Amino acid sequence: MIRLAYRCAVPILAASLVACVPFESLWRKTKPAAKPEAAAVVEPQLPLAEATHRFIVSPEQDVVGRLQVTVSREEDTLADLARRFNVGYTEILRANPGVDPWLPGEGTQIVLPTEFVLPDAAREGLVLNLAAMRIYYYPKREKGAPIEVITHPIGIGKVGWSTPEGSTKVISHVKDPVWTPPVSVRQEHAKDGDILPATVPPGPENPLGRHMMKLAWPSYLIHGTNKPPGVGMRASHGCIRLYPEDISRLYESVPDGTRVTVVNQPYLLGWRGDRLLVQTHEPLEDDKRDWSDVPKNLRQNARRPRTPLWKRIAEHDDAIDWDMVRIAAAEPRGIAFPIGPGTGRDLAATLAEAPRVRNAIPRGATWDGVEDQYAGDPQFAKPDDADETKTSTSP
């Protein structure tokens, strides 16, 4: 049922985003009338969530963040909640099977997948896990200094335009970029009757958003977006998209020359203290690997450990509940839970123990709640109604 719901909801949203169809209804809704103060008594008693994008980790730690649960309001969509809590659309959709993504409804419990198992990759520069649709940034540090990691959701290339795996680097930064659609992209759009211009100037119609980092891979970029609901989806032509508020911070902190490592790891194991956690994501549609027996695949890594993570897993292989891994792989919800050593916890117990938080922008979040990323910039100021009327009637 999880996979069916995901496959039904995502293509509808993706089609609108890829085809550049206006998507105002999802993100910019008419503000509902204010409710009587008495109607909002219960929720403010819940604690405000802490932002889950920046962490300090030890070399032995592989899991950051914490699973949380909130309650939706009548006007919410899952896309609203995803941006509010800095997760991607697919992440929140998979974590909440059976919840209507467009109308979750007043009082519906919403699982916030804000606990993350780090990819098994060198903790250096930018690390992207395509299957999880997440980026991790490890800033340079002095020897002996704590390890910092910053993580955000990303959108990646759609089927047929996959984001490549491997290693590259950031070679330049561009603020308010001009978009020059490649010939291949213009041809694809033309087949659907959508004629793209040769260039798109900076501004609200530019799909690159306000910040762009070029990679050494030709034609591949890390950039913002003018359609935030597409973050956490496969809707690009291979580039990596972030929420405007996230790319603006990475743009300022990631220097040219930063290493970029792209991996594709749908099934993640990681240590938090002396407990091993599993986090499963559905493999990408064009992932050609055989995942019919996930525990077997993972245990092969333990038999030939190449990293400290797998060496430690190999030492505790007999104490790990591999049957629980099989169950998690069969219904991938992106929720991490322990599988040993010792008594593990199933998904239901993990959800029951998750803290309940207020449905509001978390403390320390990257987003301030302003949907228009161009607001306050006179360069992109919108004309007032009088000016618009005058322009439309002029010869």
What are the functions of these language-model segments?
Residues L26-V63:
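Post-signal peptide N-terminal segment of mature Sec-exported envelope proteins
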Residues M1-A9:
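Bacterial N-terminal signal peptides that target proteins for export
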Residues P119-N226, E252, T280-H281, D286-T391:
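Gly/Pro-biased beta-strand-loop elements
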Residues F23, R73-L103, P146-E148:
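LysM (lysin motif) carbohydrate-binding repeats in extracellular/periplasmic proteins that recognize
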Residues A51-N86:
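Primarily a LysM-type cell-wall glycan-binding module
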Residues V18-A19:
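C-terminal motif of bacterial Sec signal peptides marking the signal peptidase cleavage site
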Residues Y251-D293:
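N-terminal targeting pre-sequences for secretion and organelle import
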Residues E75, G105-I110, G257-V260:
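Loop/turn positions that initiate beta-strands
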